[in-house]
Amino acid sequence: MKILRFATLLIICALAGLSMTAENYPSRSDCLWVTNPDHSDWLYETGEDAVISVELYRYGVPVDGVTVKYTIGDDMLPADKEGTLTLKNGRADINIGTMKKPGFRDLRLEANFDGHKFPHHVKVGFSPEKLKPYVKEPKDFREFWAKAVAEDKKFPLTYSAEPVKKYTTDKMSCQLIRLQTTPGGKAMYAYLFIPKGGGKYPAVFCPPGAGVKTIKDPLIHRYYGEGGMIRIECEIHGLHPDLSEEGFASERKARGNYLDMGLDDPDEYYMKDVYLGCRRFLDLLTSLPEWDGKNLFTQGGSQGGALAITTAMLDDRVNGCVANHPALSDMTGYLGDKTGGYPHHFRKNPEEATPEKIRTLEYYDVVNFARHLDCPVRMTWGFNDNTCPPTTSYEVFNVISSPKEALLTPINEHWTTVPTERGHYEWIKSKCK
C-alpha cells in the first residue's frame, strides 16, 4: 500500500483545457481564505486536538478586526459547536477539538462585507485509516452479480460505429459507438478513440460522472489515444451526445432522480443495466483487433470512479483500476449516525429508509465491490469534498485488499487537477504488461 500526501495553503494554478496557466489570484474573488492545520498533512490521531490558523485577505490585504462566524461538525453532518472569532491583522487560531472515533471534522467559516457573504470550510481527519463502512454486504452478493453477468453474456455483443471527424486527430481516430445493452433495445453511447499506426494497444474504459448530460469534453484526455492507448468515454442513459440542450433538459426532468428509480428491488434498480452495460463495454474493447490482448483498465471520477470499481470487480480481465473520489459508497451511512456517500440517501429523510431500499443499496454499494477487487488500484481524493466526502473515499480504500496506492490532496473539493489526471495515465502505463 502506498499513500502520497500533498498539503497546500493556496491553490496556485488556474486550469483551462489541457494547459496550466499560473495566476496570482485564481479564485478571482474579493476575499481569499487561507486555513492551515497545525499538522501539515491535515491528519491527526483520535484524541488529539487540531488547531487551525485562519487568515482572511480582502483585495490581497489582511483584514483586521473582522468578526468571523464559525461552526464545527463532523463530515457532512450538522454542526455541534458554533462561535465567533476576531481576526487580528487578518489572522486567528482556533482549536476545533478532536474526535473519539475515526472520521473528519469540518470547520465552516463565514465573513460578511457590504452585505455579501464569503464562506469557506476546511476538513481534517482523525485516524481515517481506521474508518469502517456502515453498509453491510449481502450474503449472496457475489452470487447475485455472477448470475447477472452470466445472464447478460447470453445476449450477443451488438453495436454500431460511425466515424467522428471533429474528434479525430493525426494520431488517433474517433468513432461514435452505440452499444446495445439489453435484448429489449436499451443502449449506451460512447466515443471510441484508437491510436493510428496499426499496432496493438492497451485499452482503457472511462465511465461518466453523475447526471443526465452529454459526454463531457471528449478530447480532454486525448493523450491516451495519442499516447498509444485505446480509450472509451461513455454515457449511461442511452442519449445521443449531439442531442440538443432542450432534449437533455427534458431528459433531466424525466429521470434526474435515476439513482432512486427502482430502489425497492435490486433486479429492477436503474443502475443494474448501467453496471452491466459498463462491463459490456469491456467486451467491445477486447473484441477490437487493435487491442493488445492483455492490458485492460478502468478509470473515472465520482460516479465514474464508482463505475470504474464496479466494472473492474465484475470482469477479471481488468488488470488495473483508477478512481477519483468514488460516489455510491457507503450509501446507507447516515442511518448509522455517520457520514454517507453520494447521492446521500436518507440524509434528510431517514424515515424513507425501508428494508427493501436498504437491501437494494447493499447490492450496489461500491464498498462491497471494492472488497472483492483483485487488480491493482490507484485512488485520489480531497478532504474538502462535500459531494463525495473523504470519509467514504477512505472507507472504500480501507477495504481494498489488492495492491493499492492513494494520492491524498487535502485542499481539493470535488475536483482534480490536470497533473493528477495525467498521473493516472502514467500509472496505467506503468501497469501495462
Over which residues does each language-model region extend?
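Proline/serine/threonine-rich low-complexity linkers at boundaries of modular beta-sandwich domains
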Residues: 23-33
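N-terminal cap/lid segment of alpha/beta-hydrolase-fold proteins
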Residues: 38-42, 152-197
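Short beta-strand element of the alpha/beta-hydrolase
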Residues: 190-192, 200-210
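Cap/lid segment of the alpha/beta-hydrolase catalytic domain
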Residues: 210-276, 333-340
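Gly/Ser-rich "nucleophile elbow"/oxyanion-hole loop immediately N-terminal to the catalytic nucleophile
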Residues: 257-302
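Hydrolase active-site cap/lid region
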Residues: 305-353, 408, 416-419
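Short beta-strand/loop motif that positions the catalytic acidic residue
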Residues: 373, 379-381
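C-terminal catalytic histidine-bearing segment of alpha/beta-hydrolase fold enzymes
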Residues: 387, 394-433
